[in-house]
Swiss-Prot record:
Residues 1-48, 76-312, 324-904, 1034-1073 are annotated as: Disordered. Residues 129-148, 177-194, 430-462, 836-862, 1062-1073 have a biased composition (Low complexity). One of its GO terms (biological process) is spermatid development. This is AF4/FMR2 family member 4. The modification Phosphoserine is found at residues 120, 212, 387-389, 392, 487, 490-491, 549, 671, 680, 694, 703, 706, 814, 836, 1043, 1055, 1058, 1062. Residues 115-128, 227-251, 273-285, 350-375, 403-412, 488-501, 510-528, 549-560 have a biased composition (Polar residues). It comes from Homo sapiens. Residues 1-19, 198-217, 413-429, 568-586, 613-627, 730-761, 769-789, 799-811 have a biased composition (Basic and acidic residues). Gene3D superfamilies: 6.10.250.2670. Belongs to the AF4 family. It is found in: Nucleus; Chromosome.
Length: 1163
């Protein structure tokens, strides 16, 4: 190429990159490519281009595959299954993102790389992590990106019937499932290879690679894709255009290489990040939302492409080798979670899954395992396949749907799958409803869980079907873990938009597909294409959450086989709905385990209000699920609590979906989600709720099912209110909403800081599941509801509070009454505040201590794991705390005062950190405040920084090793407080109550800081006082015997002691002063005395300021009596001369937390 051409290409590439960056900033629209149509650069080969060509093959070779993308063969190839395995093997977290990305990449890979798959696979094994992934992802993804998506979907849909037929066979083999449409034989061959060993799973993964060298890379890309799904895909779709332009382009794509640089550099980083799952988890979750929408479309194509790619069995060995290297460590890591998971879900159907997770679980459920035991070995491999197929969960979903259509053939594999399917299904519905809440957290966790589950599956899972379950269980577990890894706020934030988008699709899928899964295999298969895309979206979004829903479909098929519970689900739902209701209410961590099914039912109800089938079908398996869940409650409760909260919502819907075939699955996700601490409380809570609600649960579930659409926008609050109100049927009806609300609070607690945004997104997401049409309004309503719960929108809150208060009154007389009242309160509290949950728990605990315990658990999650520790440390403690708090909050809960119900008590860490730790935190908060534009919010953040600066000074003061004095820290903090108070003048005519409350907090901080400054220098001040007093006496005596020097001294000192001098000796002193002034020009005050006087005045003035400012704060606080009375009650009042810095810090933080809640600033 001549220079001009290259310059033109460079310009174009720059434009593309700019476009990509802009698109990355905006949520990448799924349909719009990051780059313009790819072009091929024909120029002499260089190392990079030659390596790319060797990896991806010639464009001519790939051209045919690109053209044949729509061919069913490609669809039939189970390659998508393989990429997931590779992804799973790579890493749990990596797996999550890779799942999303790998779906896309797998879909893309079949397009171009198939011919060169073996070569590219071999090289890919070497370059898999870095170069290869870039090229392969770019080449195969680009080739298949635009057309691949459509073709894959079309081929997938076209092969829907065939895939269903073969899907049954494929259900046995996850690969066949993922590629259910086209190649059962290829799948079986792959399956057989899988059954050979985990290496077979690796093999399948390699096979995917061989099919599309880009696939492994696609997996690599998937992380970056997850962030840039559309952008990356565009970039990868870029290669197809390049291919079309010329075959040589692959050899040296100048533009191709450059775009790849951006994406690929991102991908390798992501892959490394994936491998370092923790570090990558956050970025992944953040990136996932933007990429999820794109992933949806991309995922669908990946299924057919993956299927075609899996055709190359010869490359499997190479790929297997690659897989083996990358997989073993992840498998090990995943196995541990798996073992934990199984204990959580001891269900026969899930036994295979559980067996994957842990032998203990398998033994626990030996009956199912007898059939699953032998399957377990093959299933481990199949599970790995499933993991990869989970990557293309949409494909799996279709395949699974097919198996459902043919439950008979799928029956045996289905049983194993049913476990996986239940889990996946639970996750699916939970992802529909709970996913909205746990959105990206769930996704990242789900994906990591999937990878983990797949790996455990390899170790001890039945055939392909358990792996999806394991994935699900692991996904749940991972979700729990990942949210922690990923800052809940960031993950939630990123998830909120994407989750909402997903929820639309997820809702459509969840209501349509999820319901189809639940209601019947036939429905699922028909809905599979749409569901696949949506599922894929959610899968990418939720890392494995949505993909799991396809897996769930598989398991659902098995479930159907088990009890044809999907069709019966509706029927059973009526009977079991009560349990669902019970479980829902107890869904708050305390009852999560036992009420997991119900919680999921509730979640399902929320998410699937449109499709009552889903709820009903979910509820049908609840009885067994309930029992099993009770068993696993302790285990699950032992699991991280935060996990429970995020996943509880997801597990709620999931459980409702998967409960019928195996309540075990819901249990598993729940137990994963449920931390140890809430278990005791949860169990008790669940038992209480069961007793109270079991009779009415059916009505409850049914009523929510029928009612949700009508009140759906306000359903969360209204339902809670109704539940609180009516002890009988009405109560039951409202209970599911409570579950929803509880799920929302749990989510909120999980992401206390991102509560507002997440609540809106979560509620919106669930609502989206219920009603796509109402999605926007619903998401708004959740926000308003959250705000209302915060007390800012008292109208809806008051309505619900009135209803809940009335219900509470009604319920209080009856044993069930207290629980419902508590639940509504708790729900309100959690809604109003993540931390408010504890206060709401208190109020709810008034009616039911156990319930309050569960609420407290959720609130603790929001508060921090510290609270969880406290809650878990003893349910009794929780109960005791609940009563005490209930004494504070019970009136507020019934009244639903905007302040009390939403006012939750923060849980403070008693550990002592270094001064640097607090200093860094303070600086971070201050910088955050500097960037804000809203003056009130800025002031709140500044005061928050002030509190951290005070903590820093306190640490300096307490730590003997600290050489620095805290005095400068306190002194500068006072200056910051003064600046903060200038932002919002409480005397201004437009000053609000919040402004005045904030001012009182500022004044009290300032006053106690002045007092502290005085006390730090008090010893010096006493010395100065003695010295100055002596000097003044001497100067006074000297002034009486006039002498210029003494006179001048007397003149210098009189002002401090002027009161003493003026009364008795005013005449003499005056004369002395006058004489001194007359002759004083030559007389000087000793410099030492002058300095002492200045220092003395400065130190004592601190005390004067402290008293004056304290009085000012006390006067102003009288205007905000309710707020500060409640704050004093919760935290203990601040006492001017007795409160220490720690008391001030906690008091102020609690007040700031409530101010944020009132102002809806909590995110």
């Amino acid at each position: 190429m001549n220079r001009e051409d290259r310059n033109v290409l460079r310009m174009k590439e720059r434009e593309r990159r700019n476009q990509e960056i802009q698109q990355g900033e905006d949520a990448f629209p799924p349909s719009s490519p990051l780059f313009a149509e790819p072009y091929k650069v024909t120029s002499k080969e260089d190392k990079l281009s030659s390596r790319i060509q060797s990896m991806l093959g010639n464009y001519d070779e790939m051209k045919d595959f690109i053209g044949d993308r729509s061919i069913p063969k490609l669809v039939a190839i189970p390659k998508p299954t393989v990429p997931p395995s590779a992804d799973e093997k790579s890493n749990p977290n990596f797996f999550e993102q890779r799942h999303g990305g790998s779906h896309q990449s797998s879909k893309w890979t079949p397009v171009g790389p198939a011919p060169s798959t073996s070569q590219s696979q071999k090289r890919s094994s070497g370059l898999q992590s870095g170069h290869s992934s870039q090229r392969t992802s770019a080449g195969s993804s680009s080739g298949t990106n635009s057309s691949g998506q459509r073709h894959d979907r079309e081929s997938y849909n076209n092969s829907g019937s065939s895939s269903r037929k073969k899907g049954q066979h494929g259900s046995e083999h996850s690969k066949s499932r993922s590629s259910s449409p086209g190649k059962p034989q290829a799948v079986s061959s792959l399956n057989s290879s899988h059954s050979r060993s985990h290496g077979n799973d690796h093999h399948s993964k390699e096979h995917q690679r061989s099919k599309s060298p880009r696939d492994p890379d696609a997996n690599w890309d998937s992380p970056s894709r997850v962030p840039f799904s559309s952008g990356q895909h565009s970039t990868q779709s870029f290669p197809p255009s390049l291919m079309s332009k010329s075959n040589s382009m692959l050899q040296k794509p100048t533009a191709y290489v450059r775009p790849m640089d951006g994406q690929e550099s991102m991908e390798p980083k992501l892959s490394s990040e994936h491998y370092s799952s923790q570090s990558h988890g956050n970025s992944m979750t953040e990136l996932k939302p933007s990429s999820k929408a794109h992933l949806t479309k991309l995922k669908i194509p990946s299924q057919p492409l993956d299927a075609s790619a899996s055709g190359d069995v010869s490359c499997v060995d190479e790929i297997l080798k690659e897989m083996t290297h990358s997989w073993p460590p992840p498998l090990t890591a995943i196995h541990t979670p798996c073992k934990t998971e199984p204990s959580k879900f001891p269900f026969p159907t899930k036994e295979s899954q559980q067996s994957n997770f842990g032998t203990g679980e398998q033994k626990r459920y030996n009956p199912s395992k007898t059939s699953n035991g032998h399957q377990s070995k093959s299933m481990l491999k199949d599970d790995l396949k499933l993991s990869s197929s989970e990557d293309s969960d949409g494909e799996q979903d279709c395949d699974k749907t097919m198996p459902r259509s043919t439950p008979g053939s799928n029956s045996e594999p289905s049983h194993h799958n049913s476990e996986g399917a239940d889990n996946s299904r639970d996750d699916s519905s939970s992802h529909s409803g709970s996913e909205s809440s746990s959105g990206s957290d769930s996704e990242s966790e789900s994906s990591s869980s999937d990878s983990e589950a797949n790996e455990p599956s390899q170790s001890a899972s039945p055939e392909p079907e358990p792996p999806p379950t394991n994935k699900w269980q692991l996904d749940n577990w991972l979700n729990k873990v990942n949210p922690h890894k990923v800052s809940p706020a960031s993950s939630v934030d990123s998830n909120i938009p994407s989750s909402q988008g997903y929820k639309k699709e997820g809702r459509e899928q969840g209501t349509g597909n999820s319901y189809t899964d639940t209601s019947g295999p036939k429905e699922t298969s028909s809905a599979t294409p749409g569901r696949d895309s949506k599922t894929i979206q959610k899968g990418s979004e939720s890392g494995r959450g949505r993909q799991k829903s396809p897996a769930q479909s598989d398991s659902t098929t098995q479930r159907r086989t088990v009890g044809k519970k999907q069709p019966k689900k509706a029927e059973k739902a009526a009977a079991e709905e009560p349990r669902g209701g019970l479980k829902i209410e107890s869904e708050t961590p305390v009852d999560l385990a036992s009420s997991m099914p119900s919680s999921r039912h509730k979640a399902a109800t929320k998410g699937s209000r449109k499709p009552n089938i889903k709820k009903e079908s979910k509820s049908s398996p609840r009885p067994t699920a309930e029992k099993k869940k009770y068993k696993s409650t302790s285990k699950s409760s032992q699991k991280s609590r935060e996990i429970i909260e995020t996943d509880t919502s997801s597990s709620d819907s999931d459980e409702s979906e998967s409960l019928p075939p195996s309540s075990q699955t819901p249990k598993y996700p729940e137990s994963n989600r449920t931390p140890v601490k809430p278990s005791s409380v949860e169990e008790e809570d669940s038992f209480f709720r069961q007793r109270m609600f079991s009779p009415m649960e059916e009505k409850e579930l049914l009523s929510p099912l029928s009612e949700p659409d009508d009140r759906y926008p306000l359903i969360v609050k209204i339902d809670l209110n109704l539940l609180t109100r009516i002890p009988g049927k009405p109560y039951k009806e409202t209970e599911p909403p409570k579950g929803e609300k509880k799920n929302v609070p749990e989510k909120h607690t999980r992401e206390a800081q991102k509560q507002a945004s997440e609540k809106v997104s979560n509620k919106g997401k669930r609502k989206h599941k219920n009603e796509d049409d109402n999605r926007a309004s619903e998401s708004k309503k959740p926000k308003t509801e959250d705000k209302n719960s915060a007390g800012h929108k008292p109208s809806s809150n008051r309505e619900s509070s009135k209803q809940s208060a009335a219900k509470e009154k009604d319920l209080l007389p009856s044993p069930a009454g207290p629980v419902p009242s508590k639940d509504p309160k708790t729900e309100h509290g959690s809604r109003k505040r993540t931390i408010s949950q504890s206060s709401s728990l208190k109020s709810s605990s008034n009616s039911n201590k156990e319930t309050s315990g569960s609420s407290k658990n959720s609130s603790s999650t929001s508060k921090q794991k510290k609270t969880e520790g406290k809650t878990s440390s003893s349910s009794k403690e929780v109960k005791e705390k609940a009563p005490s708090s209930s004494s504070n909050c019970p009136p507020s809960a019934p009244t639903l005062d905007s302040s009390k119900p939403r006012r939750t008590k923060l849980v403070f860490d008693d550990r002592n950190y270094s001064a640097d730790h607090y200093l860094q935190e303070a600086k971070k908060l201050k910088h955050n405040a500097d960037a804000l534009s809203d003056r009130f919010e800025k002031a709140v953040y500044y005061l928050d920084a002030v509190v951290s600066f005070i903590e820093c000074g306190n640490a300096l003061e307490k730590n003997a090793q600290e050489s620095k004095s805290p005095f400068p820290m306190y002194s500068e903090t006072v200056d910051l407080i003064k600046y903060t108070m200038k932002l919002k003048n409480y005397l201004a005519p437009d000053a609000t109550a919040a402004d005045k409350r904030l001012t009182v907090l500022c004044l009290r901080c300032e006053s106690l800081l002045y007092l502290r400054l005085f006390k730090l220098k008090k010893e010096n001040a006493l010395k100065y006082s003695k010295t100055l007093t002596e000097h003044l006496k001497n100067s006074y005596n000297n002034s009486q015997a006039p002498s210029p020097g003494l006179g001048s001294k007397a003149v210098g000192m009189p002002s401090p002691v002027s009161p003493k001098l003026s009364p008795g000796n005013s005449g003499n002193y005056s004369s002395g002063a006058s004489s001194a002034s007359a002759s004083g020009s030559s007389v000087t005050i000793p410099q030492k005395i002058h300095q002492m006087a200045a220092s003395y005045v400065q130190v004592t003035s601190n005390f004067l300021y402290a008293t004056e400012i304290w009085d000012q704060a006390e006067q102003l606080s009288k205007e905000q009596k309710e707020f500060f009375a409640e704050l004093d009650k919760v935290m203990g009042p601040l006492i001017f001369n007795a409160s220490i810095m720690t008391d001030l810090v906690r008091y102020t933080r609690q007040g700031l937390h409530w101010l944020r809640q009132d102002a809806k600033l909590i995110s």
